[in-house]
Amino acid sequence: MSFRTLDGLDVRGRRVLVRLDLNVPMRDGRVSDLTRIERQAPTVRELAEGGARVIVMSHFDRPKGKRVQEMSLRPIAEALGAALGQPVAFVDDCIGGTVEEAVAGMKDGDVLVLENTRFHAAEEKNDPEFSRLLASLAEVYVNDAFSAAHRAHASTHGVTAHLPAYAGRLMQREVEALELALGSPTRPVAAIVGGAKVSTKLDLLGNLSTKVDVLVIGGAMANTFLAAQGIKVGKSLQEAEMHDTARAILETAKKAGCEILLPVDAVTATEFRADPPTRTVSINEIPDDAMMLDVGPETVRLLTERLSGVKTLVWNGPLGAFEISPFDKATVALAQSVAGLTETAGLVSVAGGGDTVAALKHAGVVERLTYVSAAGGAFLEWMEGKELPGVAVLRA
């Protein structure tokens, strides 16, 4: 996919409207995780150092079109300033006379953060007039919010009807990484899909089963696939109503030449809590009173062996209930194997989704994979094969 980037763009003296995703975790009025801000700061810094007058806009949380003080971007603007290492101004609206005055007073290299765009109901409606008012503040539009690109809102989509639109550096990295993984990948391609429910990842499984060579199914959704094939999974979380669907996915994959890998052994317990008594058993020997809470060591060994023969890997979702010890072991072990293959065998490894990022952080391998996306819904929709409105408008 060809899209417009900041390469060669002269921004000196120009007003640049930058859409960031500043929807970050907060605790006691302070930003508790700076990852998303730090990933987007380079785009703002590059524009400011290039002499642009940078006007930042973003949503935060779900105020439903009303002004909610706890959802103000003011404290987040301060965190952005700290990440940039320069003062950042803030204005308590995103359209109107006060905002226009603040923009008119900007000098080259200044950064101004507008108030939460979702304080206006028109934002999520992609309202044309609201889009026009936002766009009227600037001469150029830059979108660096890949994680919000699956929404056709005024600040991600509507404004592009009025301004030339470019991808910021994080947006560029995200799209290029995903193109590398699923657009035109080096084969063989494998995908790991974990998580609790088949029902929430139907589109994803359907798309991947026709695009990848190897599909690894883990997490609680593996229980549903196993049960659909007549394997007794005890008291494990599973969706009985999805058995026909699971069998259909297996059949589709078979016709497409996609190899599906399911667990061959399981770590089981009779209660879901930290450090309970556990048993590791063959997948055919799960006790009636037990739950499968992680895949076993033989599954990890087989997966590591199979992945050593692929060139590209996409990962969404943990293999087990990684947030509770000891059911993190398989995810951590496989993550470390994937990191090793990335470093020594040239594996292109791209991962994303909230739980996935948390699991990879827990395993200490985020920096060792080719790319780890902090985007949740947008990453998932891209993997489902859907076009993202906020990316489509950046096409060259």
Curated annotation (Swiss-Prot):
Its EC number is 2.7.2.3. The keyword Signal does not apply. Keywords: ATP-binding, Cytoplasm, Glycolysis, Kinase, Nucleotide-binding, Transferase. GO terms for molecular function: ADP binding; ATP binding; phosphoglycerate kinase activity. GO terms for cellular component: cytosol. The gene is pgk. It comes from Granulibacter bethesdensis (strain ATCC BAA-1260 / CGDNIH1). Monomer. This is Phosphoglycerate kinase.
